Every structure is written in C-alpha cells, then in structure tokens.
C-alpha cells in the first residue's frame, strides 16, 4: 500500500474514533462508527490473498449488520423522544437494539464468531489495530449509554463472553486466534463493570491495549504466528523469550503482574454492589485464560522442540529505533501492581 493512501486511511480511522469520543449526538456517533469501519477494511486487505479478502468480507458484513441495527434503534428513539441526544435514550427497545449493535461491533458473545476468523486471516499489524483501536469507539458509546442499559441483557453477554474467551482458546495453535479469544474475554470483563463503574472500564481498556500492543510488537519482531514458531523463539532471540513469557502471564491475569489489576478491581466493584455469584463465576472462568497462556509459556521456555534453525542467536535487537517503545510498554504491561493504591480514586 502506498504511503499517501495509507496516511489517508489512518487519518480517516482516527477521525472516526475522535468523532465518536467527542459527540453526544446519535447521528454523528453513527457517522464516526461508519468511518471507523470503512477505513479499516483496506488495512485488513493489505496482504492481497484469499484469506485476507475473506476476513475483510466477514468483517464488513458483520459490522454493516450492526450499523443497521444501531440506526434502526436510533430511529425508534427519535420517534419516541424527538431528540438525537444520547442522554435521551429512554425507550427500552432502543436500549436493547443499541446494546446488541455494540455487542456485535465489540465481538461479545453470542456475536463473537467473526473475531477469531477475521483476526486469523489478517497480518499481525492489522490484527493489532482490529483488537485494540477498533474497540475504543464502541466502548465509548457503551460508556455514554451505561445509565440506560438493561443489566439483564448485558450481564449474560459479558459472562458468556468470558466463558467463550476461555474455552475457545484451549485447543488453538494459532497465536492470532488465541489473542482474539483473549480479546473476547477481556471485552466481557469490561462490559460487566460498565454498568456499575464506567470509569473502571476505561482503566481496564487502557491496560488491555498496552498489553496487547506489546505482545503483538514482539510477535511481529519474530514473525511468530504459531505455537511451533513461538517455541523456537529461544533459538532466534533469547532476550525476547522472557518478555513474551511475562506478557502472556500478564494477559492471563496472573498476580503480581499488571493484568491482575483490572480483574481484581472489577471483582471488588461487583462485590460492593452485593453481587456474589457473578464475580465468582468470572474469577473461576478467568483460570481458563490463565491455563492456555501458561501452556504457551511452558512450550516456549521449558521445552525444546526439534529445530533445524542453525542461525546465530540475537543477543541484541537488529534495529533499536523500531523497538524504542518496547521497554516502557513492557514495564507498564508487567509492573503496574505497586501503583494500585493510587487507583482508589476510581471508587
């Protein structure tokens, strides 16, 4: 893709997200979401092959359906309230349709089927954008409409997403699919706490984006896409191996790493709201994610797969300029637990 075209596409995608973040008008929110959707499709098709085209088509059909449901809900709300403001979402039908549309855009269960397939069919850099930046706009709409969302609709979606995110990643060998199922589980945690403390959802989103970005950067550096290629990382770049180990355990939520913070705070927040069964189910289900990340860690660091790679080990990075962000991102992704007391301002 030529640099001027790529620049225009990226600016359109960023502009769409900014429009959604700064708007309280339903029509402009819908326009921003459409800009976001249309801009990423050429990025998903950057590598011209049948898998990328199939992934782009699946993404387009799913997101177009979600946009249609969202516009229908907005129109019904306009018919009843006569206003476009997001704060005037009073109709239960509108609330249900908006929640369903946002769940489709985020990949929440039972609308999650497109996330692993689309992520697997794209390049690692495109998958990074899909699993991080593309979550910001729908979650911001969810943040704005959280007072009017029906808990009986959103909470079952959130719990099911955590279950699917754990079960789906158990038998996977493709790293992009594993990260996609991990994304589904993280979206479930975020949407569960949105109803009770939307600000905590923003904290969870920030930590999730940082951890996922760092993981994708390391995978792109090694051109790692499968568990087999991940198991040979020690042979190509020994310095990368412990970083990947720490990041995967952090994504799984193992204390005392950074990924444990949002899970801990979300369970605490739900318990404060006199909910016992739901956070218990969420905590137990989170062990599924931790299990398949620990299995990856075991295959990467504690076993030696048969390898024909005779190249010399890389004890330093080839291009330091490309990896300049890796050190701060790795520190934030693994060592945020000591600052947890400062996060009491979210209560």
UniProtKB/Swiss-Prot annotation:
Its placement in the membrane is given as: Multi-pass membrane protein
Q: Which domain of life is it from?
A: Eukaryota
Coarse class of the protein's main subcellular location? mitochondrion
Recorded catalytic reaction(s): these are: a ubiquinone + NADH + 5 H(+)(in) = a ubiquinol + NAD(+) + 4 H(+)(out)
The reply to whether Oxidoreductase figures as a keyword in the UniProt entry is: no
| Enzyme class of the recorded protein, top EC level | translocase
Q: Name one GO cellular component term.
A: mitochondrial inner membrane
Function description: Core subunit of the mitochondrial membrane respiratory chain NADH dehydrogenase (Complex I) which catalyzes electron transfer from NADH through the respiratory chain, using ubiquinone as an electron acceptor. Essential for the catalytic activity and assembly of complex I.
Q: What's this protein's name?
A: NADH-ubiquinone oxidoreductase chain 2
Say which species the protein is native to.
Mungos mungo (Banded mongoose)
């Amino acid at each position: 893709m030529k640099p001027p075209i790529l620049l225009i596409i990226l600016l359109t995608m960023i502009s769409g997200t900014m429009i959604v973040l700064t708007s309280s008008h339903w029509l402009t929110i819908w326009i921003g979401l459409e800009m976001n959707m249309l801009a990423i499709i050429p990025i998903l098709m950057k590598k011209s092959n049948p898998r990328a085209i199939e992934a782009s088509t699946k993404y387009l059909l799913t997101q177009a359906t979600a946009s249609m449901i969202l516009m229908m809900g907005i129109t019904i709300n306009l018919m009843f309230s006569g206003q476009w403001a997001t704060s005037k979402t009073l109709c239960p039908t509108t609330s249900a349709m908006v929640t369903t549309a946002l769940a489709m855009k985020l990949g929440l269960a039972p609308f999650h089927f497109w996330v692993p397939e689309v992520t697997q069919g794209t390049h690692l850099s495109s998958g990074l954008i899909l699993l991080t930046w593309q979550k910001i706009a729908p979650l911001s709409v969810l943040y704005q409409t959280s007072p009017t969302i029906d808990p009986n609709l959103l909470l079952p979606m959130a719990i099911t997403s955590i279950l699917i995110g754990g079960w789906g990643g158990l038998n996977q060998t493709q790293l992009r699919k594993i990260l996609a199922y991990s994304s589904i589980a993280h979206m479930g945690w975020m949407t569960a706490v949105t109803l009770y403390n939307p600000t905590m959802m923003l904290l969870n989103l920030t930590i999730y984006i940082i951890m996922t970005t760092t993981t994708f950067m390391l995978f792109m550096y090694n051109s790692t896409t499968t568990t087999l290629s991940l198991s040979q990382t020690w042979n190509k770049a020994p310095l990368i191996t412990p970083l990947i180990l720490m990041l995967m355990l952090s994504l799984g939520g193992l204390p005392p790493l950074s990924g444990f913070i949002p899970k801990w705070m979300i369970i605490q927040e739900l318990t404060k709201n006199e909910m016992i069964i739901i956070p218990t189910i969420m905590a137990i289900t989170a062990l599924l994610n931790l299990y398949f990340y620990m299995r990856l860690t075991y295959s990467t660091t504690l076993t030696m797969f048969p390898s024909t790679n005779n190249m010399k080990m890389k004890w330093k990075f080839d291009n330091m300029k490309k990896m300049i962000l890796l050190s701060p991102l790795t520190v934030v992704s693994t060592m945020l637990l000591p600052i947890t007391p400062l996060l009491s301002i979210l209560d």
